[in-house]
Amino acid sequence: MASAVFEGTSLVNMFVRGCWVNGIRRLVVSRRGDEEEFFEIRTEWSDRSVLYLHRSLADLGRLWQRLRDAFPEDRPELVRAPLRQGLIAIKDAHDIETRLNEVEKLLKAIISMPRKYSRSEVVLTFFERSPLDQVLKNDNVHKIQCGFQSPVKISEIMRSNGFCLANTETIVIDHSIPNGKDQHGAVDPAEHLFEGGGELPAELEDGDDPAAYVTNLSYYHLVPFETDILD
């Protein structure tokens, strides 16, 4: 299963000031044609730098697990935190726009947690650029100039040109992901929501390009000034 790979953090004395979910990319992550959905996240840091990240539902689930492992004495408090409920809400969302909004709500809750957690190595590493982010950064992405019929929080709307990760012959695989077989004691049902790749229900209709980019706006929100860009 593809995943963003996190190996420590170089973001010393920095923290995430804000984050927004721009959309979803459905990427081919194996030569067998297996696909996985990645949320594109725009992050603004304390030094005013901006990073675009791509994280899957499984990555979000592992972040929660790593927080619990990093702060074992605070596990009861973390279980009551919005993170667990947010993960379940994302898993249960059957509408794409609702799912994107739930992901954004969850990420904002994470960076709003007490500094002990929000500025911990676990959280900063999650928001650090991964090898997958670097690969996708070089992808040709069309920036669409938009007008809005109703207030929208997203500041930048983008659409992919059908990028396929397998075409680059670069597949990022995290072999260190625990399979859960060695866990003992009481098991939280939420921990198993993200096993097996954290698959989400397919929202694309028949005939749609499976690699198409889905923005955090409905068709009625998006009114491009140059419609030929979308042809």
Swiss-Prot record:
SUPFAM superfamilies: PX domain (SSF64268). It comes from Bos taurus (Bovine). This is PX domain-containing protein 1. InterPro entries: PX_dom_sf, PXDC1. The gene is PXDC1. Disulfide bonds: none annotated. GO terms for molecular function: phosphatidylinositol binding. PANTHER family: PX DOMAIN-CONTAINING PROTEIN 1. It comes from the Eukaryota.
